[in-house]
């Protein structure tokens, strides 16, 4: 076998030397050094100083990222590693992706699956299937259908999917015609994944569905109450120990049960899995001790039932592979390690790894060493804390102690129980044991109808989930009114809940409010209002439960304190999303009243409704939370859901264990989850609320116990990750204990990897992939800089991290592959790949030149001919709309970067006493086209001077101007008005003539029909023009086109850059001024003023040239205005 076997003594060393893995070691690069590299190659496209750093090839944004990037999905190094490791060419049968939440496990699994699918497509018959099993299978399908780069849908189909999604959302109903069209389209795409006749290779199952379909209980089995779990059980559930023979004989027991007619194994599924691929997401769910199920049994069976060479390959995924108990490591390793590779060829049993006495468990001596050995080559570990992509996690509160021991890792918001809560807690005795139906006492207690007044001595509340609904439902109306309690009418999805003023921070004086019943929820409400007053930011509130003190009561608490749900109308007590003031008292003049709103997600809400609420919460339009400020979620949000730009997370109850708490943190701390926010706001503050008593309290005791158990799990995690296959590439080094890991160092470091091995890289097609990667890098570089020499381009391509998202070691690129990439992009004129650069269709051309060949990004004209255009990349081409835009309506639809009304008012102010000609160079094309149409259609008053300027420069035309052209005059002769009435204007390509002001219809004619020559000869000194830079217009100059000779291609690089006049050297500025005849003492004039003189001189000369006889046909060109087309030089070699 070309790849090393797992039992090789130097397995990781051999693996690390292979180029397909070694190249994924991301080289360390200093940020300042990287910026220097960007500027050295003239490819800085954003950030401070980008115009200078990029030499102004294209307009740049000083607030944007400085790095060129590759459009679309790019697999990161960890994803590439596991794709290369677990594929049909390697011998490795099972792999666990132990990656933190939000790092792209699903994409990695899909990338692996794609490799197997490509392999299976070569089978003539009986091709295996790829099974995706897990609670989050729908999310994996969604990723497959929204990422054309993965190869399952086209870009056109993704665009259509987005269009249908938008239309369906606008309909506001899940049953509308638009929604049905969307569902039909999605179903068609999904069938492509699963229908073999359409090229599908996938089967998608939930864990429960998979287990049920694999093991069919017969009628005889039902009569005997047969349970598959009975064949695979723990002999002593209380002690969590296993019978010696339970696991080892499980497959045999299934066969016996099948022979006895109690069960039927689905042979169709088994045959589909033979030699196939099994992907199991959130694998910790299948063997969790606290939630008994047969999910893990089904997976274990399909992995053990086949001979080793026929068993399906497997990819397991989890950020927290062991959750409920450290002894789950036995179940995990039995799934992860093939049976024949376990000690003695038998499944592991718990007594092999653990000593247990009562409820106390500890690792046996040498048990962790066994975990290390068994997991070598079977685990990928990723803990990514790169603050460039992840928001900072901030814990509010402080560390607490329980029984004189400080609880590790976590900070808490300490919430002392109210006196009423403490009195209620006393009812459970001095050392209370909180049963599962009494968990509400951790959060709050409810008013008790046993007492007419809850404030009377010895009164206590309700908290038991069995007793509370009955007691409150039977309470009298008078008692309910007296205590501010309102029973919410039960429904199928919400059998019982209450509301009322007892949940308010400010109840009527005769009613005890929220502070009386819950110290925790009172603190939560105070914190919410404080956050709103501080400024913007979305809030996620988590509670593990739905009923009693869970998310349903949280919903009522918010509503009782002035926070609305998604649909309710504001009332006088509704709070403002900006200042938290109630509407009746809202006196702020600096902002309008916007109601605070929340939404809720839990398992009893229809999935379609949940998806719509989540989409609205995550929408870019809701970045500040002014549409939906708060989302309340139950345990349904713990896995699979992603939340964008959440600034505050409030955790109101501990999930089942600490690993699941980490999952909850991971819902809001995700890669790129905060990229739309300003850098200063890319953080999440976590509020972990805990109810306490003077001696600590039962909830704090629960946290203490779970953290103690978690330390044992962390010891196992460290052993599991010790020899991770990608430790040397991910370079995860942890120096001190942290929530996600104990101290850890990779067993191999980049420094001791060794010499590069190429045999598998060349044999298995990785060279072809390198060519594709280099091609994408080349394209990105041309999008930043349009002209390169061969050596410059190769140096840039081989510079690490120059392209955003490409973090592989470019220094390992082969120059032969670089040459192949160039050939693939520009081998000949007919074979050149078409690219979109700066919204223009281009191709990369090879141009022979001396001393070194050039590669140029040439724009394609309408005939798809390459054009080497001097100004293509810096000219702001904005054609006018093909319909009239009235000024009043333009404000609603303008696509300019500054509203027309703002520019219009500025124009009226600035040009009262200034030369009107200056308007042509102070405003963008979009302003002028809108103004011209307004002058023609709306007949704006008081604009005579502006009209005269437009006419002087032959931009606007009156009836009188058209009369010399009889055939054209017929088009506008019927338009009302005298000879001086404006009827048309010139654009880059045509003259637009009004045919009906009422209908706003236009007729277009070529420019030459009015004797306008777009290719007038340029003067021999200098050419001026204005370039749009954000909201500003910059005056630029360049040499005349005739200076550029077709055989002097190297000059194109200089001309393509353009030149802001002020950046030119003083000597050059003075020379130009002298040639233009500007006679002043130039030595005492600043560069800015000198450039203004040059600009105005060129504009004056342009006007004079146009007004000479036949000036628009033969006049000399001095200045290109907003509606002038820049010249091109077509390269014909």
From Swiss-Prot:
Domain Helicase C-terminal: 524-724
Catalytic activity as recorded in UniProt: ATP + H2O = ADP + phosphate + H(+)
A Pfam family annotated for this UniProt entry: Helicase_C
Entries under SUPFAM superfamilies matching the protein: P-loop containing nucleoside triphosphate hydrolases
EC number(s) given by UniProt: 3.6.4.13
Residues annotated as domain Helicase ATP-binding: 52-352
GO MF term set: ATP binding; ATP hydrolysis activity; DNA binding; RNA helicase activity
Induction, per UniProt: Expressed in the late phase of the viral replicative cycle.
InterPro entries listed in its UniProt record: Helicase_C-like (IPR001650), P-loop_NTPase (IPR027417)
Swiss-Prot/TrEMBL keywords: ATP-binding, DNA-binding, Helicase, Hydrolase, Late protein, Nucleotide-binding, Transcription, Transcription regulation, Virion
One cellular component (GO) term of this entry: virion component
Localisation: Virion
UniProt KW Manganese keyword: no
Residues given in the record as ATP binding sites: 99-106
Family: Belongs to the DEAD box helicase family. DEAH subfamily.
Biological role: Putative initation factor.
Protein name, per record: Early transcription factor large subunit homolog
Annotated organism of origin: African swine fever virus (strain Badajoz 1971 Vero-adapted) (Ba71V)
């Amino acid at each position: 076998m070309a790849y090393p076997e797992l039992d090789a003594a130097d397995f990781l060393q051999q693996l690390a030397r292979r180029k397909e893995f070694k190249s994924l070691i991301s080289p360390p690069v200093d940020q300042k050094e990287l910026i220097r590299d960007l500027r050295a190659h003239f490819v800085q496209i954003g950030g401070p100083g980008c115009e200078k750093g990029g030499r102004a090839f294209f307009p740049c944004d000083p607030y944007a990222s400085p790095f060129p990037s590759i459009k679309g999905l790019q697999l990161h190094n960890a994803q590439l590693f596991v794709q290369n490791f677990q594929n049909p060419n390697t011998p490795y049968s099972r792999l666990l992706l132990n990656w933190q939440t939000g790092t792209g496990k699903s994409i990695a699994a899909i990338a692996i699956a794609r490799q197997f699918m490509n392999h299976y497509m070569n089978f003539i018959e009986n091709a295996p299937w790829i099974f995706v099993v897990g609670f989050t299978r729908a999310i994996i399908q969604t990723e497959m259908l929204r990422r054309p780069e993965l190869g399952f849908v086209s870009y056109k189909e993704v665009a259509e999917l987005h269009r249908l999604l938008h239309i369906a959302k606008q309909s506001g109903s899940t049953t509308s015609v638009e929604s049905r069209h969307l569902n039909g389209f999605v179903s068609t795409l999904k069938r492509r994944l699963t229908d073999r006749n359409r090229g599908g290779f996938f089967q998608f199952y939930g864990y429960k569905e998979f287990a049920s379909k694999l093991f069919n209980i017969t009628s005889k089995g039902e009569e005997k109450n047969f349970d598959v779990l009975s064949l695979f059980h723990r002999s002593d559930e209380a002690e969590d120990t296993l019978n010696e023979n339970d696991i080892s004989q499980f497959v045999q027991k299934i066969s016996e049960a099948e022979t006895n007619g109690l069960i039927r194994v689905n042979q169709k599924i088994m045959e589909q899995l033979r030699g196939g691929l099994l992907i199991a997401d959130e694998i910790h769910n299948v063997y969790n001790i606290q939630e008994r199920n047969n999910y893990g049994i089904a997976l274990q069976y399909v992995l053990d039932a086949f001979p080793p060479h026929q068993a399906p390959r497997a990819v397991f995924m989890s950020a927290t592979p062991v959750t409920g108990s450290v002894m789950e490591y036995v179940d995990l390793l039995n799934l992860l390690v093939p049976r024949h590779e376990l000690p003695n060829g038998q499944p592991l049993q718990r007594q092999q790894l653990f000593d247990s006495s009562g409820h106390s468990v500890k690792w046996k001596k040498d048990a962790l060493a066994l975990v290390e050995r068994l997991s070598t080559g079977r685990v990928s570990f990723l803990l990514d804390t790169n603050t460039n992509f992840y928001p900072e996690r901030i814990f509010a509160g402080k560390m607490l102690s329980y029984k004189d021991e400080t609880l590790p890792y976590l900070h808490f918001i300490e919430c002392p129980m109210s006196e009423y809560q403490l009195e209620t807690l006393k009812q459970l005795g001095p050392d209370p044991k909180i049963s599962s139906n009494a968990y509400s006492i951790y959060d709050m207690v409810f008013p008790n109808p046993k007492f007419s007044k809850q404030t009377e001595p010895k009164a206590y509340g309700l908290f038991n989930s069995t007793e509370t609904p009955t007691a409150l439902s039977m309470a009298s109306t008078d008692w309910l009114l007296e205590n501010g309690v309102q029973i919410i009418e039960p429904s199928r999805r919400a059998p019982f809940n209450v509301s009322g003023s007892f949940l308010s921070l400010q109840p009527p004086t005769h009613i005890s409010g929220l502070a009386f019943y819950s110290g925790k929820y009172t603190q939560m409400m105070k914190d919410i209002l404080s956050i709103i007053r501080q400024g913007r930011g979305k809030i996620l509130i988590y509670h593990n439960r739905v009923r009693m003190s869970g998310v349903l009561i949280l919903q009522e608490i918010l509503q009782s304190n002035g926070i609305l749900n998604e649909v309710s109308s504001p009332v006088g007590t509704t709070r403002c999303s900006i200042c938290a003031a109630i509407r009746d008292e809202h006196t702020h003049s600096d902002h309008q009243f916007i109601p605070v709103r929340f939404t809720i997600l839990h398992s009893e809400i229809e999935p379609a409704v949940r998806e719509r609420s989540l989409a609205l919460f995550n929408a870019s339009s809701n970045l500040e939370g002014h549409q939906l400020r708060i989302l309340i979620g139950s345990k349904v949000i713990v896995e699979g859901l992603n939340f964008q730009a959440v600034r505050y997370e409030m955790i109101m109850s501990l999930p089942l264990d600490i690993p699941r708490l980490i999952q909850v943190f991971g819902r809001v701390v995700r890669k790129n989850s905060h990229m739309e926010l300003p850098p200063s706001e890319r953080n999440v503050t976590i509020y972990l609320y805990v109810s306490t008593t003077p001696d600590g309290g039962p909830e704090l005791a629960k946290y203490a116990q779970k953290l103690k158990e978690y330390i044992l799990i962390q010891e196992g995690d460290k052993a599991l990750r010790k020899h991770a296959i990608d430790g040397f590439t991910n370079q995860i080094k942890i120096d001190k204990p942290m929530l996600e890991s104990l101290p850890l160092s990779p067993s191999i470091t980049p420094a001791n990897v060794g010499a590069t091995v190429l045999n598998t890289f060349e044999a298995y097609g990785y060279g072809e992939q390198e060519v594709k990667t280099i091609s994408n890098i080349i394209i990105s570089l041309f999008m930043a800089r349009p002209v390169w020499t061969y050596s410059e381009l190769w140096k840039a391509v081989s510079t690490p991290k120059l392209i955003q998202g490409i973090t592989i070691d470019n220094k390992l690129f082969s120059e032969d592959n670089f040459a192949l990439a160039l050939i693939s992009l520009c081998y000949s004129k007919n074979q050149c790949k078409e690219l979109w650069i700066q919204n223009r269709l281009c191709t990369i051309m090879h141009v022979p030149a001396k001393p070194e060949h050039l590669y140029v990004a040439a724009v394609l004209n309408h005939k798809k001919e390459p054009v080497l255009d001097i100004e293509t990349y810096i000219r702001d081409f904005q054609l006018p709309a093909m319909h009239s835009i009235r000024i009043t309506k333009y404000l609603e639809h303008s696509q300019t970067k500054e509203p027309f009304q703002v520019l219009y008012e500025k124009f009226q102010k600035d040009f009262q006493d200034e030369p009107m000609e200056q308007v042509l160079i102070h405003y963008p094309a979009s302003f002028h086209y809108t103004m011209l149409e307004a002058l023609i259609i709306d007949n704006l008053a008081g604009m005579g001077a502006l009209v005269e300027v437009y006419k002087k420069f032959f931009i606007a035309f009156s009836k009188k101007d058209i009369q010399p052209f009889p055939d054209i005059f017929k088009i506008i002769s019927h338009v009302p008005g005298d000879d001086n009435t404006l009827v048309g204007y010139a654009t880059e390509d045509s003259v637009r003539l009004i045919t009906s002001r009422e209908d706003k219809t236009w007729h277009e004619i070529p420019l030459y029909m009015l004797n306008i020559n777009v290719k007038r000869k340029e003067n021999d000194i200098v050419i001026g023009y204005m370039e749009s830079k954000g909201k500003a217009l910059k005056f630029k100059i360049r040499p005349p086109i005739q200076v550029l000779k077709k055989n002097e291609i190297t000059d194109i690089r200089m001309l393509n850059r353009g030149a802001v006049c002020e950046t030119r050297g003083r000597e050059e500025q003075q020379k130009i001024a002298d040639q233009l005849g500007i006679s002043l003492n130039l030595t005492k004039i600043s560069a800015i003023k000198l450039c203004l003189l040059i600009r105005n001189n060129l504009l004056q000369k342009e006007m004079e040239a146009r007004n000479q006889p036949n000036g628009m046909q033969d006049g000399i060109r001095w200045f290109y205005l907003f509606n002038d087309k820049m010249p091109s030089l077509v390269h014909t070699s």
